[in-house]
C-alpha cells in the first residue's frame, strides 16, 4: 500500500513539473508574439550595413607603393603583388595587384597595416559567382566602387537597431 501511495506522489509531482515546464514554454512563445518579424525578403529588401562592416576590399592603384606589407600581415599570404624595380629612380613600380575572394577571410589586416591607405573595406557583400575563378579580382576589378544600397531605388533598405 505504501509503495502505491509513494508511486502516486511521484506521478503527481512529475505531472505538476511537466505542466510547469509546458506553461513556461508557452509564456516564452507568447512573449515573442508581440515582436516584429525578423525575416528579410532578400532580393527586394537589404540591410544597411554598419560602418565597420568588412565587405569587399577596394584598391586604389595610384596610392600603392608596392611595399608588400599587406602580403606579410595576411594570415594566408593572399594578395598577389607584382612589381618591377625602376633602376633610374630606384623605386618599385606596381605592375599587378590581385586578391582571390574565394580564399580571403576578410580579417582586415591588410587594410589596417597599409601605410598609404590604398586599401579599404566596402559595404559590398554579394560576391557570388558560378565559377570560383571569377572571384579572383585584379586591380581593375578591385578599383571599382560598389553601388550603394541606399541609392538603389529598386531595393527597400532596412536599418537594424
Swiss-Prot record:
What does it catalyze? a plastoquinone + NADH + (n+1) H(+)(in) = a plastoquinol + NAD(+) + n H(+)(out); a plastoquinone + NADPH + (n+1) H(+)(in) = a plastoquinol + NADP(+) + n H(+)(out)
Using the UniProt record, name the top-level EC class of this enzyme in a single word: translocase
What are its E.C. numbers?
Answer: 7.1.1.-
Q: Which GO terms describe its biological process?
A: photosynthesis, light reaction
Q: What subcellular compartments does it reside in?
A: Plastid, Chloroplast thylakoid membrane
- Membrane topology classification: Peripheral membrane protein
Q: Pfam families, alphabetically?
A: Fer4_7
Recorded hits in SUPFAM superfamilies, A to Z, give:
4Fe-4S ferredoxins (SSF54862)
Where this protein primarily resides, as one coarse class? Answer: plastid
Q: How is the cofactor bound?
A: Binds 2 [4Fe-4S] clusters per subunit.
Residues covered by the 4Fe-4S ferredoxin-type domain = 55-84, 95-124
Query: What are the binding positions for [4Fe-4S] cluster 1 in this chain?
Result: 64, 67, 70, 114
Indicate the quaternary assembly.
NDH is composed of at least 16 different subunits, 5 of which are encoded in the nucleus.
What name does this protein carry? NAD(P)H-quinone oxidoreductase subunit I, chloroplastic
Amino acid at each position: 500500500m505504501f509503495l502505491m501511495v509513494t508511486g502516486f506522489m511521484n506521478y503527481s509531482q512529475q505531472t505538476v513539473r511537466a505542466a510547469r515546464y509546458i506553461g513556461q514554454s508557452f509564456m516564452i512563445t507568447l512573449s515573442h508574439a508581440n515582436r516584429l518579424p525578423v525575416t528579410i525578403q532578400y532580393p527586394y529588401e537589404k540591410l544597411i550595413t554598419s560602418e565597420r562592416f568588412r565587405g569587399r576590399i577596394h584598391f586604389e592603384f595610384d596610392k600603392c607603393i608596392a611595399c608588400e606589407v599587406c602580403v606579410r600581415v595576411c594570415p594566408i599570404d593572399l594578395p598577389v603583388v607584382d612589381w618591377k624595380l625602376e633602376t633610374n629612380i630606384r623605386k618599385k613600380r606596381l605592375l599587378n595587384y590581385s586578391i582571390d575572394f574565394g580564399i580571403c577571410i576578410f580579417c582586415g589586416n591588410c587594410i589596417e597595416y597599409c601605410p598609404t591607405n590604398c586599401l579599404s573595406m566596402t559595404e559590398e557583400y554579394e560576391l557570388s559567382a558560378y565559377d570560383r575563378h571569377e572571384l579572383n579580382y585584379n586591380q581593375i576589378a578591385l578599383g571599382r566602387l560598389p553601388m550603394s544600397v541606399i541609392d538603389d531605388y529598386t531595393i527597400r533598405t532596412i536599418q537594424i537597431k
